[in-house]
């Protein structure tokens, strides 16, 4: 599991097929870590 604590980190180069990643994003006006599956857009 790879988590980044910044919304500005480019994870597109580090993700792999089926890899579990986390991204720091704004949801409902709150910055937080959210789990995603696979590569980021």
UniProtKB/Swiss-Prot annotation:
InterPro entries: Snake_toxin-like_sf, Toxin_cobra-type. Keywords: Disulfide bond, Secreted, Toxin. Its main location: secreted. GO terms for cellular component: extracellular region. GO terms for molecular function: toxin activity. Expressed by the venom gland. This is Maticotoxin A.
